[in-house]
């Protein structure tokens, strides 16, 4: 494997292009279960390179069932608590420092342990526009009702294929 073709062609580097997100910034999303999501780096802000999100679970059970993506890989890094990660074959009780990489097509799922808070990082590559998907799911958790067709369209548009 080799390095990709250069995307920056300058000679002296750039000043002012880095982006900082402070830990105390408010989350972009909150749902009734107490789960919050912080958009650390979106596909738009990384020019499509990746999307990185901090997912803080509240004590109520939360997380998607088994699914896969055709166009993006997804990785999980547990920061605190216990997160149940499904690797397509079994559920794994992941603890701080545990990491799971799921390539395109890999079946996976995640959920917190009921009654316990937990936190993890979600990394998508390339940086697909996952924000609309997350926002719609949080709207549904907050009472929005989707028709079956709207739900099906949402999943197809955002490369979410349930198994």
Predicted regions, residues:
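Long, hydrophobic/aromatic N-terminal blocks
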Residues: 1-41
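A short glycine-rich, His/Asp/Glu-containing loop-to-beta-strand
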Residues: 26-66, 72-73
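Acidic/histidine-enriched, glycine/proline-rich intrinsically disordered or flexible terminal extensions
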Residues: 133-163
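Short acidic-glycine-tyrosine-enriched beta hairpin
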Residues: 89-107
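Short, conserved beta-strand element in jelly-roll/cupin
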Residues: 54-58, 68-87, 123-125
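Hydrophobic small-molecule pocket/channel-lining residues, especially in calycin-type beta-barrels
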Residues: 62, 69, 83, 109, ...
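Ligand-binding loop in jelly-roll beta-barrel domains
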Residues: 46-48, 84, 104-131
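Tight coil/turn sites that cap or link beta-strands
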Residues: 58-61, 97, 105, 115
């Amino acid at each position: 494997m080799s390095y990709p073709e250069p995307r920056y062609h300058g000679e002296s580097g750039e000043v002012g292009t880095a982006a900082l997100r402070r830990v105390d910034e408010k989350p972009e999303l909150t749902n009734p279960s107490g789960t919050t999501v912080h958009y650390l780096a979106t596909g738009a802000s990384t020019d499509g390179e990746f999307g990185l999100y901090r997912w803080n679970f509240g004590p109520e059970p939360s997380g998607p069932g088994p699914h896969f993506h055709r166009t993006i890989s997804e990785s999980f890094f547990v920061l605190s608590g216990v997160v149940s990660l499904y690797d397509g074959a079994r559920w794994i009780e992941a603890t701080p420092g545990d990491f799971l990489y799921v390539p395109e097509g890999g079946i996976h799922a995640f959920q917190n342990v009921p009654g316990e808070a937990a936190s993890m990082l979600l990394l998508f590559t390339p940086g697909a526009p996952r924000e609309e998907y997350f926002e719609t799911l949080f709207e549904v958790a907050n009472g929005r009702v989707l028709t079956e067709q709207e739900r099906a369209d949402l999943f197809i548009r955002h490369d979410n294929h349930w198994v």
